[in-house]
Regions:
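Serine-hydrolase catalytic machinery in alpha/beta-hydrolase-like enzymes
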Residues: 1-4, 10-78
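Alpha/beta-hydrolase fold active-site loops
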Residues: 12, 126-127
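Cell-envelope and extracellular/periplasmic
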Residues: 18-20, 74, 78, 88, ...
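Soluble non-cytosolic domains of exported or imported proteins
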Residues: 25, 57-64, 100, 139-142, ...
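Alpha-helical scaffolding within the catalytic cores
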Residues: 25-32, 69, 112-121, 142, ...
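Primarily recognizes the serine-hydrolase "nucleophile elbow" in alpha/beta-hydrolase
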Residues: 81-125
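C-terminal catalytic histidine-bearing segment of alpha/beta-hydrolase fold enzymes
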Residues: 129-131, 137-138, 142-195
Length: 195
């Protein structure tokens, strides 16, 4: 599903990945208001299975589907630089893996309540935004973001980390903060060829 904000040509593109058992349409609702404010188009695909294929252990058909969806969108002018991959819950875990493995293509990663870091062969150095609710009972902050953010920083990534009073969710204020951080950046992505 492709969402283009009203009132003109979007200046950037966000690939938004849903949580386990979710849909692209539901994940789009998490960031739509923030995308409107930032003049950002959002591509929100559905995973090929109940969750993204790298979460069980390795990349598979979801990567090829995402690559095809991006190739179909970018030539039509909906995408602009920079390009970010984002996700919520399992989608955030997948976004961190996909974005780090394709850092030459994705300039930014936005991870809302990720679970863990999937081992990958990183390329490039995308900026990373991570948010997590202190009362998250689905993916507890103590064993998730408070562990993976220091690991990302140790690996040399610039990480903006935002804890908030809340549960397993993406509050509008957090979505806007993440989108503003992304919107303030410049850069040219390369052609869409994912690892």
């Amino acid at each position: 599903m492709l969402y283009v904000p009203p009132g003109g040509s979007p200046r950037r593109l966000l690939l938004m990945l849903h949580g386990a058992g979710g849909t692209g349409r539901r994940s789009l609702r998490l960031v739509m208001a923030a995308a409107d404010a930032a003049s950002c188009a959002v591509l929100a695909p559905d995973s090929r299975g109940p969750t993204w294929d790298a979460v069980p252990g390795r990349f598979g058909p979801d990567v090829r589907f995402i690559e095809s969806a991006l190739a179909g969108v970018l030539p039509e002018g909906a995408g602009a630089s920079p390009l970010a991959v984002a996700g919520f819950s399992d989608g955030a875990t997948y976004a961190l893996a996909l974005g780090r493995a394709n850092g030459q293509f994705f300039s930014h990663i936005l991870a809302f309540s990720p679970g863990f870091l999937i081992p990958t062969h990183p390329t490039g150095s995308p900026g990373i935004f991570v948010s997590h609710g202190r009362s998250d009972q689905v993916l507890p902050i103590e064993t998730c973001s408070r562990v993976l953010v220091p690991e990302l920083r140790h690996d040399g990534y610039q990480v903006r980390y935002r804890e908030f009073d809340g549960r397993h969710e993406v509050p509008l204020a957090v979505a806007r903060e993440a989108m503003d951080w992304f919107a303030d950046s410049l850069g040219q992505p390369e052609s869409p060829r994912l690892q």
